Amino acid sequence: MKLALLSLIGTALATPAVMLSHKELTAFEKYTNKQTSNSISAVELDRVARKLMHDCSANTYVVVNQPGLKAKDFQTESAFPFLKKLLERTSTMYTVPYADGGIELGKLANSVAKQCGAVKIDVNLDNNITPLEEYMDTTKRVIEINFEPLPNTYVSRLAALAANDEMLEKIVRATPSPFIALILTSQKGEEGDFETRNPDFKIFPGVARAKTVPGAKDKYKYHMELQNVPVDEKKLTAEALLKVKTPPTHAPEVRQTGDGELVDDKLLLMIVGSVVAILLSLLVFNGLMAAKPDVVKVDKTDAKVEKAVKKEVQKKERLVNGRVEQLKRETR
């Protein structure tokens, strides 16, 4: 009987929660740093979630409901590869293994939409290819995701968690902006079974330790690099937001030359262009050279004409002078 009582004391309803924001929220961190235990009440969990989401610094707010989630699920970190990557590349993270119950995520999503002037959009979890239609504008949006309850068997449970993490990645990558705030927990009334609490357990402890290293947060400050595109929040403009995602790169087309070497099409065009330019230059030069003798010939003709005119003038002058002298003699 005594052992049974001790077991009940150590076992209670417990709901884990993971929260993150792209931005370093100093006030939020000061608030959560006051927490001295890895267990909090459901009321406090709701307060922390609203404090994170109502900051309104993000373009996208993702509210994830995973019914039946337990703290021990995070012991297998390999089931959450994308979520872990998000936590590594965000400036603010908060995790709590044990909350005394879930929160009303639907109400949270509605309050964020109202507080931040965001639009709620639906996610089609039945479409495994494109659960969320891509959009290119920067209007703030709240994305509410409601996964199916987790199976009870260990292998099936891990498979479901991994599949949901993959679905979360597809949804997040469909958004145009890397400025994201996210919460993942269980909806009130859909919590997991009672679970023995470990006072030393932490969710993703390695990620949390890495963020305490000096300068670690500056590496990803204000951006997540989801598409390997460094984004600076201060310099990002509305036009640049449309180009956050890396444009597809195409391999250069090549042609096989006679010697068996591959030639890039762009290089080939440059070579052809250079040859054409050289040929045009030669044609222009030859045209100028061909025109030059004609100029000399014209110059020589003009000189002959001028010389003949001078002779004719001199001849006439002599005739006039001779006639004048003759008249003078006759008058004497």
Curated annotation (Swiss-Prot):
Domain of life of the source: Eukaryota
UniProt subcellular location: Endoplasmic reticulum membrane
Any one of the GO BP annotations: cell wall organization
Protein's UniProt keywords contain Endoplasmic reticulum: yes
GO cellular component, one term: endoplasmic reticulum membrane
Alphabetically ordered keywords of this record: Cell wall biogenesis/degradation, Endoplasmic reticulum, Membrane, Signal, Transmembrane, Transmembrane helix
Cleavable signal peptide: 1-14
Membrane topology summary: Single-pass type I membrane protein
Residues that span the membrane, as ranges: 267-287
Lumenal topological intervals: 15-266
Coiled coil: none
Role of this protein: Required for normal beta-1,6-glucan synthesis.
Similarity comment text for this entry: Belongs to the BIG1 family.
Designated name of the protein: Protein BIG1
The species this protein was found in: Yarrowia lipolytica (strain CLIB 122 / E 150) (Yeast)
